[in-house]
């Protein structure tokens, strides 16, 4: 547990580098006295050592000569880890600058420091020199100048008791009949009570049973489970554990089973003490929640034990108590559970101090009234030492210390009533009167209820009882447990409640208590009358104590406090009179430190003593403090044994103190020896402030305290029930967040239970008021405000009362788990460090921005690859020179002539059995059959367009070659999907109409699908509506077979088909949005692709090929239709339908037929991975598994695939990604590289500027892991070019990928668009590259890296291609370029309710829009800040609109890819079905609701998504 969050920040004016390494020996350092153990020394020794340490460690005159000091330089520090602090520079801390239009990009990306705009002028030694001799040394502990005696017998000194259990035995004998505890009900009536004799007897009985029957040893832990109303049973068991020598572990929360189990496990407790009623209730709770009883724990009902009866002439068992008394478990501000160990010695130290303070509290004449004047019904039997009245929980913290332990130590009578009793007007004051209370313990929440009830209706208090009038004259101390002193309220309590009700000195009676609830509830400051003030004040000054200065206050300058400086404008009465002045803050003091405590003000970041009048963390050392956390040694060392440092005036170096302190986590200061607390470290907000002075930009941090902000909100904002405020560290900046609880956020319901519309206008008004009031009163630029219903924010238990836990709220806010109904952002004011590009108007590709990059990288080489030409030479199988071949048809005739009986194709069925072998002769005959049939059709002529609609089969290959021979232009397309007819049919009709399709060739399976009733009706109706005449459908598989060969038919290729501009083949590519792209390839290109594929993959005729999925285009097409003919090898065909039924069949075929090179899509591999097949075959033969992709590769996805398949025998070197697109199926590949792909980490911040900069760590939020796409194959050359200026990019920047290759497509089919035509004959601006380049439209870069070519191979340099993504999908904000996929990945990782792949980011009308498919539609407002923060932190942009839609509403392709274009179109046209829309910046301009108002429409329901299993298998993979 570390109570200080790991956030950077500069603490006030003290900016120092923490001490690192060893500290040089120094004469001053040797003067420190070792004080490592607080519990093994006597109180006197501890006090003397503490004083000696203070006097020797801090030179004379250090405090007296101190002046208010301002440090002008500012530097940030952050907490790192739990045990130490260190300085963090660069990316972790500093803010990215605003880059002007003419920003110097060289400075921006210089080394590892990314745009720091915080500079330090002074050297570190000069900073230390400012502190030498000026630091404020710790306040010395005070002595108790008199012996502490028993209030009932002044002859008995309490120091003779060695433990608190011995004191109880003493009370049981000498105050036997006096009442020890009285428990009241909610109406103030006595519920139960117990005398000291019975209390001691029952405790002895519990101890006896534990000793005799439990089997526990000394120091074993025993759990105590009692409810607050069972306080007497709790006290009995607690002291029973003390007497028995075991360690008590109180547990106060029964509703949290996980917390109970954690405590039982941590403490290894085997025994639990409780009551019969409590045990039955606990059993019912477990049964209701279907939980099991904790294991290995025995449960005893102590209310059935009775009392202890000592035999005649027998002596009491000796007390052999261990060091530890009890372990108190509590939660830290961030919700972590930890136990604090309390020893018996610690208890006695604190009891002595508290007894001395109570003994010196002033008593008044009326306090000595004859008890006969009071109703004897209540006063008879009460202790004459004093009566203690409280409603705080007696089982923990200060309630346990004062209400139980100190009651036993001082012999008081404690009267306890439930917290609900304070809500009864007049009851509390009458209880104090009835019992003649000497001391009462309260908290602000209860005391405010009591006091304000009296203010509203005094008669309810004064007339509450007819027996006696209200009189608080006997009250000596009204103790209030609080963290901050409420100056205004303590005036009200003193002057308008205590004084009117008879208290003679109300200001002295009111005693704020500064306690440490996280550390056992120990008191570190409270009002006392012991003396020693002259040692607390500067120069020994002691002001006379009067009733007027019993309440100490100061009026501080608000602006100075923001810089952690204490500038006092007025004190005490003057402060009260001037508190209404603007820009001031009124702060009240607790009092001097606790009598035996050493207290220091320390800079929490540097651990160096602060200067006077500077806010710092309160560190304290005292014998009354706990020894540490239970079973957490590292946290104990960091928190309970912290060491501060002072600056030597000789060496100007930090000298560590040997005295150990407890870090309280409280921020405050000391003035005239009194302790002022501003709040917890976690409750302090900080915000960056920038301004320009004399042309120099300055940056500092203003600090604000949650308590001040909350008070302002509660006073000025209407309809706020409670609130929380904190800051979050996003984008290297602290951003204030406010969470409001408001009754307006309760979801209204009608009488029938139906929910009605929420008044979002009222919620918007409340949040607007909050933003404006904090800006006006505190100059806090709020980042966002969220609203939820009352009692929904996370709370912590303090004194039995639930209070909002700021750090728990922050954690829940960051995780998006709170039930918020509304969120309002004010990013325009709060976010300062949004980066701006070099050219904010024209973007990163402009001449100006490109010129800056060119100047920055002027010493780097240009990015283009080499070119190795590999033209056709000899056919390896036939040893025939094929350099003169111009078409695949010539190679086919070569196979028929030379190897007619060799097998060309074999079909594999679903069981892995071979079908009928197709030899080259039969193949030739089947192609001739289709040629002969088509020649008879008059409308089939060379140059005509035909569509090949086939399932994966050899019929498709026959038809393809028949088209080649006849000079037809084939366009292969898959069959129509009956599940997506609304998408497929329009695309098919578009193809027919715009490209004048003469015929559609199909096989039997495709024909059956077309003739299906649903499909045929849909097709005919759509054709009629679109006025499209359907062409002839020819079923080629049903043509009568004939035995003539192609040669015998005397079929000759038309010469026009050999023209380089003639499209021999047209590939149809559908984007995820189902946008059709047709690319044309001539015969020479097809041969070149085969040649490049053969050379790069080292393919031979000796190994067969396999065609299975995606056979209509790309690599799948070549492996299915062309490579077998080109190599003269056998091609095995596996139907995608059979693969879907048995995914392992693919690898069984590969293993059986020793296939060396094959391909698979990402969908194919993902399908296999999801099916989890067993009995994998041996895959050692597979050397090259090609995975085509047309964009950026997911490094995490590839790693997971690789890990899975390597586990099943596939070589990690076999994974070969292939970069391909519609213009070239084989642009780059990792085939046979002999190296495992290693992600390269790129800096996203540099990437936005167009630069490539490696990132040093994957833990950085801006680190982008990127995999390469391999090397450039033969006969191919790549260049990286600026897409706008057409200048070659240099190494260190990225640009558009241009390619020159014989495998490039010749054109977009029948396109006359000048832009399309320009893409196919691109040249750079200076002509360096020459002509013939094709622009891919993808962004990427080339980089030379060193890799080992396989295991035990030498390291070689490789030029690798990295693909970033399509340039058409990028968008620019402030002149910086962003890839939507990166932002979408960030969003999907940010919250578990965001579906994977369920995010779309795009730019519309200049606004960045985020559309999210959410899981569930409740409390979507809680997710919005998580999304905005994640985008801001990783990408430094702010989304303008966040819209939510139900899961399944995204249009998706048959491959389950989201269709960005359709989502954008539906958003622009208002047809996107959204459940809520949040405007972060700007308004909806009438399209939706007004600015910042969510659009909640519960009537909308998501449509069921189309499962990928329901589509045709060949379209899935």
From Swiss-Prot:
Renumbered residue ranges of the record's region Disordered: 1-26
Spans through the membrane: 231-251, 397-417, 510-530, 612-632, 720-740, 956-976, 985-1005, 1051-1071, 1114-1134, 1261-1281, 1353-1373, 1408-1428
Query: Where is the protein found, in the record's own terms?
Result: Membrane
Principal subcellular localization: membrane
Q: Which UniProt keywords apply?
A: Glycoprotein, Membrane, Transmembrane, Transmembrane helix
Give the glycosylated residues.
Answer: 35, 40, 76, 917, 1178, 1321
Keyword rRNA-binding carried by entry: no
Q: Name one Pfam family in it.
A: AMP-binding
Gene3D superfamilies from the xrefs?
3.30.300.30, N-terminal domain of ligase-like
Composition-biased stretches (Polar residues): 1-13
| A cellular-component GO term for this protein | mitotic spindle
Keyword hit for Membrane: yes
Q: Which domain of life is it from?
A: Eukaryota
BP-aspect Gene Ontology terms? acetyl-CoA biosynthetic process
Q: Do you know which SUPFAM superfamilies this protein is assigned to?
A: Acetyl-CoA synthetase-like (SSF56801)
State the membrane topology: Multi-pass membrane protein
Q: Which GO terms describe its molecular function?
A: catalytic activity
Q: Which PANTHER family match?
A: DISCO-INTERACTING PROTEIN 2, DISCO-INTERACTING PROTEIN 2 DIP2 -RELATED
The family assignment reads: To S.pombe SpAC22F3.04.
Instruction: Output this protein's name.
Output: Uncharacterized protein C56F8.02
**Organism, scientific name:** Schizosaccharomyces pombe (strain 972 / ATCC 24843) (Fission yeast)
Q: What is the lineage of its organism?
A: Eukaryota, Fungi, Dikarya, Ascomycota, Taphrinomycotina
